[in-house]
Amino acid sequence: MDYLITFYHSPQTNS
């Protein structure tokens, strides 16, 4: 589940 880590470390959709 690397996507979760990447997503968590990449708050691009953190409106």
UniProtKB/Swiss-Prot annotation:
Physiological role: Conjugation of reduced glutathione to a wide number of exogenous and endogenous hydrophobic electrophiles.
Keyword annotations from UniProtKB, A to Z: Cytoplasm, Transferase
Species of provenance: Pseudomonas sp. (strain M1)
A GO CC annotation given for this chain: cytoplasm
Molecular functions (GO terms): glutathione transferase activity
Subunit annotation: Monomer and homodimer.
The family this protein is said to belong to: Belongs to the GST superfamily.
Keyword set includes RNA-binding: no
Superkingdom assignment: Bacteria
Protein name: Glutathione S-transferase
Its EC number(s): 2.5.1.18
Protein localization: Cytoplasm
Catalytic activity line of the entry: RX + glutathione = an S-substituted glutathione + a halide anion + H(+)
